Amino acid sequence: MAVKRLIETFVPENYKIFLDIDRKTKKIKGQVAITGEAKDTVVAFHAKGLHFNKVRAFSVDTNFIENEEDEEIVVKIGETGRVTVSFEYEAELTDNMMGIYPSYYEVNGEKKMLIGTQFESHFARQAFPSIDEPEAKATFDLSVKFDEEEGDIIVSNMPELLNINGIHVFERTVKMSSYLLAFVFGELQYKKGKTKSGVEVGAFATKAHSQAALDFPLDIAIRSIEFYEDYYQTPYPLPHSWHIALPDFSSGAMENWGCITYREVCMLVDPENATIQSKQYVATVIAHELAHQWFGDLVTMQWWDDLWLNESFANNMEYVCMDALEPSWNVWESFSISEANMALNRDATDGVQSVHVEVTHPDEIGTLFDPAIVYAKGSRLMVMLRKWLGDEDFAAGLALYFKRHQYGNTVGDNLWDALAEVSGKDVAAFMHSWVNQPGYPVVTAEVVDDTLILSQKQFFVGEGVDKGRLWNVPLNTNWTGLPDLLSSEKVEIPGFAALKTKNNGKALFLNDANMAHYIIDYKGALLTDLLSEVESLENVTKFQILQDRKLLAKAGVISYADVVNILPSFTNEESYLVNTGLSQLISELELFVDEDSETEKAFQSLVGKLFAKNYARLGWDKVAGESAGDESLRGIVLSKTLYSENADAKTKASQIFATHKENLASIPADIRPIVLNNEIKTTNSAELVKTYRETYIKTSLQEFKRELEGAVALIKDEKVIAELLESFKNADIVKPQDIAFSWFYLLRNDFSQDAAWAWEKANWASLEEKLGGDMSYDKFVIYPGNTFKTADKLAEYKAFFEPKLENQGLKRSIEMAIKQITARVALIDSQKAAVDKAITDIAEKL
């Protein structure tokens, strides 16, 4: 049922908010006055978990009704027009990282608490009565009093104006949506700097971390703001930009205007323990949130069905920004590895959501944050659009968009209009097929009787209903003489031989630089030509060959055995991008390989041979001056070499562990997870698991925590696994924000999978209570869908989750997971014998 839009009866202009918060009792006392235009004599405001003592309108006490089911308070004001409605109420801090909530941490054994906020998507109503809809923009005058102790500070969207008897009064905000209001208070340390234009930038964290961990995020934040001000040709509109790392945080980060909050692992970088990958990850997260300060905050989607306007764009701009700031990182390679790969896999399942999807009820909003679609696919579409328009027109169109719609709300067509006005191209016509339709096409390229035939149809992994969808496909070819777009089902280009001669006889490939959202099925001589030139191709094209052939095999268009046969073509590759593509393909092939089988021995041998040259080249030790690509590649090479049972690698891993066993954090960060994993696999020691868990609890290094949790999940000891699962109930050991990741590490390993699955089913009610509404909640639906591969597990999954299909927040994820498991089971059944044979044959020949 469609939810009511409360802005239709009341349009807010200003909120005056006073909050008195007591950390010890976890109680909130609130006073809020909302000034705006009443369009009816009875108006409603969003409120959830608020207990009202008094409501006034036109300075007179008035009647009200609390409607818990619709999360509303209905107020009878008696007349229409401009009015101030005031509320006095009480509430409690939440325990699910939504609304106003506590974050817990320790410093030198002393337990401490921060208070922070998370109001996106519709959780401002848990803190104060409001029109909690993105279109209902207003200004906010915030005042906060709390049980202040020595060393405490408070930060918010705007600078603090004054402090009166412990009441912190902040400057009025600019006009913005309710979900962007934020504040954090507690004992925080910080470092500050300024941009060239004078914006004050600060990085904040608890004293559980070294101050040095603030240097990298502060530098990236300053340079990112400077980049965006120049690229957007629009000044950053606030006096400051605060970046706060919170010990407990539901998602990765939140773009609160001027007061951005982060999960600690997404912001802090310890210079003594940081890998190049962790730096790149943190930098792109910060750049993503800062992109939102314009696209999402200054200009905001009108309703949640255009959430992609926020997330797709910011996900694209984080790479544009980092490519400009750190060109040696080659971040577009990372884009292909992560975003493109994620989008292509998820978007190939029938029933997947489109980028733009109708939202009728707030409970559905959580399903929109599908990272593979709204973030990854959406950003891939923005990359495609930027290439089609050219960067100059793309940037100029954005500048026009911000100028035209600043402090307002938009729909997707408003962006297309601005880009079209600058470029002269029909952007809406080009983009609608991509944004409004689910899925993507496979473009088949073949030569028949000297005619090149290019055709498109929707690509499915697993069963899918072909509805005849067509896309405006940018061919982005390396040849001249071909059309720019494939908009029809098929195009035929005669005179192929002459066309090839005109292009110097080089092999034809499409989708240059992997910038458009489709894959290619090269038939016959076209594939043979491409593979014959593989060594001279660009790295991204080599990656695409691996990517596309893997997906075609996954869909049953070709056999995985055919994919195994092309692996020897990639034994000499030194590129991080190509070797990552190789690693991803190997992970897919592991589905077919039974543990402790003859095929596994052959597969291990094959993997070892594929990575042997890079193992000899890179070894275990970082070399001064080596490229970011080599530093990133080392971990992949070592992991695959150890999988191959290479004796030298296993000996060296054990030696490194022995050297650092008294201080595991001192293992060089780029090889640390490899060493930690190997020691558990080699010893299968319950005592070592205990050591890892004790280290996990004590360390404040968030990346190190992840590594330790991944390593302990490799244990093959039923008693220890049961203890690990039981520890998820203790927030002093595993924080609620980390349960999903820790549990998945156990679920994905064959030995512990049954126990992890049984634990989920037995603890579903408590998970729902603890994490319901949290962005990690549906991971407990999605992760089994990404993992299970047998008919028995499919039946168990359906038996457990099909009764939960009425839950709108989980419905799509359940349906998608069932289709994914079904397809995986069918794939293994149909191709296992051929794949096993191909692995054995190639391993002997290589």
UniProtKB/Swiss-Prot annotation:
CDD domains recorded: M1_APN-Q_like
Entries under Pfam families matching the protein: ERAP1_C, Peptidase_M1, Peptidase_M1_N
GO molecular function: alanyl aminopeptidase activity; metalloaminopeptidase activity; peptide binding; zinc ion binding
GO cellular component, one term: cytoplasm
Biological processes annotated in GO: peptide catabolic process; proteolysis
UniProt keywords, alphabetically: Aminopeptidase, Cytoplasm, Hydrolase, Metal-binding, Metalloprotease, Protease, Zinc
Cofactor(s) needed for function: Zn(2+)
UniProt keyword Ribosomal protein, yes or no: no
Enzyme nomenclature, EC number: 3.4.11.2
Residues that, per the record, bind Zn(2+): 288, 292, 311
Function recorded in the entry: Aminopeptidase with broad substrate specificity to several peptides. It has more affinity for oligopeptides than for dipeptides. It plays an essential role in the metabolism, it may be involved in nitrogen supply or protein turnover.
Quaternary data: Monomer.
Recorded family membership: Belongs to the peptidase M1 family.
Protein's name according to its UniProt entry: Aminopeptidase N
Species the sequence originates in: Lactococcus lactis subsp. cremoris
